[in-house]
Amino acid sequence: MSITAERKTALIKEYAKGNKDTGSPEVQIAILTERITNLTAHFKTHGKDNHSRRGLLKLVSQRRSLLDYLKRKEEARYRTLIERLGIRR
């Protein structure tokens, strides 16, 4: 259900603006998207896991807030990010 440290590092390298960038909205949204994808796959086999479903809804809400922030600040970055991640919006 969780992502490995190696995968997280790869996501940070892929979406970061600089060497030490781990907190930009793009990086945070990419990590949240990976976690959401993993949880969605988990629910295909564990449909009654309501405790984890609540966590999924929290992650989706957090990602939505970050996406709204990015859209408000710089729409061009927002558009390229949702295109790269394959998020429908």
Curated annotation (Swiss-Prot):
Disulfide bonds: none annotated. GO terms for cellular component: cytosolic small ribosomal subunit. This is Small ribosomal subunit protein uS15. CDD domains: Ribosomal_S15p_S13e. InterPro entries: Ribosomal_uS15, Ribosomal_uS15_bac-type, uS15_NS1_RNA-bd_sf. The keyword Aminoacyl-tRNA synthetase does not apply. GO terms for biological process: translation. Part of the 30S ribosomal subunit. Forms a bridge to the 50S subunit in the 70S ribosome, contacting the 23S rRNA. One of the primary rRNA binding proteins, it binds directly to 16S rRNA where it helps nucleate assembly of the platform of the 30S subunit by binding and bridging several RNA helices of the 16S rRNA. One of its GO terms (molecular function) is rRNA binding. Belongs to the universal ribosomal protein uS15 family. Keywords: Ribonucleoprotein, Ribosomal protein, RNA-binding, rRNA-binding. It comes from Methylorubrum populi (strain ATCC BAA-705 / NCIMB 13946 / BJ001). It holds the Pfam family Ribosomal_S15.
